[in-house]
């Protein structure tokens, strides 16, 4: 077995900062600080290999470990001049702390003051001449060891402690006497014996059980949950750091604290932190005492109270930041005016702080632009783009679903798009539905937020909400709607229409009432770092957009064009939907043509508005894609209105609706199949697009950059047929306007057969755009709207590593994309490549698209900054 113990301290170290995999984050930091000659308590690190051995061998330690541990303690005794378990003078007490390879603050266990018993306590009191301190350290040990190692409920210790304080009429911890501490310690001992039938006095037995407790804590519930939330592997294991105790609770010249080298909230370049005099580290964390600031304008700061120590701490903080080239989170203890650094690690920070610090460090010539970009978590930019809930206050959620679209919104509950429109004039509304359909678009548009009982992260509600930049929570299976009573039920809570709720689309939480919100900010530094990203990345970022508002937001966030304009979204405008329904239900070609002719000028104006905003940036328009049933009326009132407008009996409307019913419409009469079977629809759309281009050119001198895209191709014959129809319309309009139209023609690759047949298809088009939503659905045979019913179980059982509709499945779907690119390029070397599914805004998937040499990705407007950073990071990683 490899070496299990590495030393660090005043005499140098066996390790260094590069050894995080075996020493853990904390151990590697201690080793590095030792090499930098910084004042740290002497100690040693037990490697992560012990943790992995422990779990592979039924929670047993290696046979040779006890000897190696004994040698390490002996070496520590020689270094410190103290004896572990000494009952005569100067005893060595230890801290035992976990240390994962990835920082997991507070998730695993720590034991302080280890090695204590009655005799050691007396020896400690004699050696330092401070019995109160010795008893306080013993009391802390019994509590921490009891709750952490022996699993005695921690509140029982707190109850004993508080009971004695009340009986003695003492309210401040600083007023506790020796006599009272002795009584508390006696009761703590009795509690140990009550739960474990013994009081463990042997320091070596304490040490072994503490080591095992830290190892067990690797798989405690909170650590498991934290790793899942942060995608940390179970296989890393934890190291264990054992150090001599240094005491911040020796009196007024001793203290403990935490300092950040810059503000973790804003990134401001000044020390930020807190400390407590006469305390140990857990006192700051527990909140039992109010800490004081490191820097302040009053006499309560460390700068004022301990100026010499403050100067030393400032120098060390600067040295550590310049050494690690990143903001540091530093824990320290002061023992009788002597400063010790207990730990340093890269500090966690808000998104705005991360950006500000990265920009500052480039300007200070500490790091490069590439390093600055790699410091930014792309997903954290959601904090800058959306309103969010202020969780600094304690809040209790009534339910939780899937975080489908980030941001927070407060409003009154409404259960229909009609009520949303009606009430939105005077109130902010939250639209609550079982699920949404394209028919709900007007209600979604006016709503401040959307909540659905069903659906997943790529359901209709989620996709549309992300495109609109609206908060959305989906798949809230612990909620139910009673449509007749118009109520939302969350356990025992009944929410009526008009009641106020708050939803958090970033966490999936739902709250009753109005919650405190934080407004988004987008600073000059944010703009600058995004500009750096564009300088570096080779993958362009476009937007999925079909309205002027979408386009304006996209340009604001740096989109280099529109990569997907879903033309059918324009049909859901209240002025157009009746005409669309007329066109679909029309019993003959003449009536259909009549409805289309009425739609033509409306569509023309829509496209003109979009081209006008985008100027000469590329606009990729997808011809009508969804099945026609999505446009059809569902309410009796709408059916009657349609019958009246067509001058047809209501019974015929019902017959037509029944005739158009499909068992599985998403794999039925949609996409290019509509264009082939009902060619007049695509012909109208193409005429509207080209007329818009011509009128802008002639009347406003605006040149458009059109890309025309055919959806749901599976067969090259489909492309050939539609291509012939498209160019027939183009030729007719060129003759009409005496104008030569210039555009590129492409297709979606969103079916496995299209990917496999891409060699033939590529000969007929200028570009492919991978529609990864449908490609994932058809590769897996899973509906993205129904995956929420089993996805949690698949993730729990590790059948899926992640949601395949959020992070691209490289092994299956990715392989089809590789095949399509290879075969497509073999017959058309100039073939352009893009991706426009939800994956196009996912950083992990963007790295794959970069590797595949795509020209662009196209995502929801509010994902554009995230995609820009992710695209740059993909390029940087490739070059490193």
From Swiss-Prot:
Region of interest: C-terminal: 539-879
EC assignment: 2.7.9.1
Positions carrying Phosphothreonine: 458
Cofactor(s) recorded in Swiss-Prot or TrEMBL: Mg(2+)
Start and end residues of each stretch annotated as Central: 406-503
Class of enzymatic activity (EC top level): transferase
Catalysed reactions, semicolon-separated: pyruvate + phosphate + ATP = phosphoenolpyruvate + AMP + diphosphate + H(+)
Region (N-terminal): 1-348
UniProt xrefs under SUPFAM superfamilies: Glutathione synthetase ATP-binding domain-like (SSF56059), Phosphoenolpyruvate/pyruvate domain (SSF51621), Phosphohistidine domain (SSF52009)
Gene Ontology molecular function, alphabetical: ATP binding; kinase activity; metal ion binding; pyruvate, phosphate dikinase activity
InterPro entries: ATP_grasp_subdomain_1, PEP-util_enz_mobile_dom, PEP_util_AS, PEP_util_C, PEP_util_CS, Phosphohistidine_dom_sf, PPDK_AMP/ATP-bd, Pyruvate_phosphate_dikinase
One Pfam family it belongs to: PEP-utilizers
UniProt: substrate binding residues: 566, 622, 750, 771-774
Key words, A-Z: ATP-binding, Kinase, Magnesium, Metal-binding, Nucleotide-binding, Phosphoprotein, Transferase
Documented activity regulation: Activated by light-induced dephosphorylation. Inhibited by dark-induced phosphorylation. Both reactions are catalyzed by PDRP1.
Binding, ATP: 97
Region (Linker 2): 504-538
Residues at the catalytic site: 460, 836
Recorded domain comment: The N-terminal domain contains the ATP/Pi active site, the central domain the pyrophosphate/phosphate carrier histidine, and the C-terminal domain the pyruvate active site.
NCBIfam families for the chain: PRK05878.1 (NF004531), pyru_phos_dikin (TIGR01828)
Biological role: Catalyzes the reversible phosphorylation of pyruvate and phosphate.
The protein's assembly and partners: Homodimer.
Misc. comment: The reaction takes place in three steps, each mediated by a carrier histidine residue located on the surface of the central domain. The two first partial reactions are catalyzed at an active site located on the N-terminal domain, and the third partial reaction is catalyzed at an active site located on the C-terminal domain. For catalytic turnover, the central domain swivels from the concave surface of the N-terminal domain to that of the C-terminal domain.
Family, per entry: Belongs to the PEP-utilizing enzyme family.
Entry protein name: Pyruvate, phosphate dikinase
Native species: Rickettsia typhi (strain ATCC VR-144 / Wilmington)
Gene: ppdK
